[in-house]
């Protein structure tokens, strides 16, 4: 089971392109469901529904010949494709009919959708300004990307606050122990700093 990365999406652009984008990612049978990865960069058909790792060597070799990948898992995790196991999950988008903006939220496995994915989307919709913010608390990192005209114009990622990193490390240290003693826990303060309880 992966750590879930939380993602916020903000898109701005001409009203007609906003509508086109929504129509592309909106489920045609359920207007309240959206999929970004599988609609904006579809997985090659030969890999869809297959096993990972690929057990049939003939199928794997044909997949490699067509896609450069032996199974769906390798393709999806490649940073030149989605960069994450399942694409986006639990995707919600908000806009109105005369809108020039879309706001959204979705989750991804282990990390955000790749920069290469968003560059491809930006090449398809060059007049849209696309910004993505992400945070994965399990591994304590966060960041943001911005794209326009088929280019990444801003990219930054870093560890989150030192307190969060130390908290993650403390949890990791004690994850296998039966009892965690209070003196070993990190106690947050409202100032954003941290302190451990009595030494």
Give the predicted meaning of each segment:
Residues 1-199:
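Intrinsic low-complexity, intrinsically disordered or marginally ordered coil/linker segments
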């Amino acid at each position: 089971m992966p750590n879930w990365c939380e993602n916020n999406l903000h898109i701005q652009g001409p009203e007609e392109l906003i509508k086109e984008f929504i129509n592309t990612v909106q489920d045609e049978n359920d207007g309240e469901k959206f999929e970004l990865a599988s609609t904006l960069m579809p997985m090659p058909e030969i890999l869809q529904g297959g096993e990972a790792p690929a057990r049939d060597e003939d199928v794997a070799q044909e997949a490699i010949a067509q896609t450069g990948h032996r199974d769906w898992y390798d393709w999806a995790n490649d940073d030149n494709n989605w960069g994450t196991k399942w694409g986006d999950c639990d995707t919600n988008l908000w806009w109105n009919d005369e809108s020039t903006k879309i706001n959204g939220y979705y989750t991804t496995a282990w990390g955000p959708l790749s920069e290469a994915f968003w560059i491809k989307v930006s090449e398809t919709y060059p007049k849209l300004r696309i910004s993505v913010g992400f945070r994965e608390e399990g591994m304590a990192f966060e960041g943001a990307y911005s794209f326009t005209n088929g280019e990444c114009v801003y990219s930054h990622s870093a560890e989150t606050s030192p307190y969060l990193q130390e908290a993650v490390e403390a949890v990791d240290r004690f994850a296998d122990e039966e009892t965690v003693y209070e003196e070993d826990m990190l106690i947050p303060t409202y100032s954003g700093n941290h302190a451990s309880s009595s030494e």
